[in-house]
Amino acid sequence: MKEGIHPNYREVVFQDMSNGFKFITRSTIQTRENIELDGKTYPLAKIEVSSESHSFYTGQQKIMDTAGRVEKFKNKFGARASGKLAK
């Protein structure tokens, strides 16, 4: 393999932001934050959903906040988002 062209494959902590669950796995993800876990410092990747919070795995239905996404879409596209196409 060529030197210097492959991303850094390392242990990373992924933290589920909905319930605080953390797990360590190997990844090439680029992160800006670090976290100390078990006396060792790891890069931290924050995620919205994991197997600990996803309704498929937990068996509990959870309503996700989509209102913010809809408002952001409407602000971005304005009148075009009304569903009426100009002829």
From Swiss-Prot:
The keyword Ribonucleoprotein applies. GO terms for biological process: translation. Belongs to the bacterial ribosomal protein bL31 family. Type B subfamily. Keywords: Ribonucleoprotein, Ribosomal protein. The lineage of its organism: Bacteria, Pseudomonadati, Pseudomonadota, Betaproteobacteria, Burkholderiales. One of its GO terms (cellular component) is ribonucleoprotein complex. InterPro entries: Ribosomal_bL28/bL31-like_sf, Ribosomal_bL31, Ribosomal_bL31_B, Ribosomal_bL31_sf. GO terms for molecular function: structural constituent of ribosome. The keyword NADP does not apply. Coiled coil: none annotated. It comes from the Bacteria. This is Large ribosomal subunit protein bL31B. Part of the 50S ribosomal subunit.
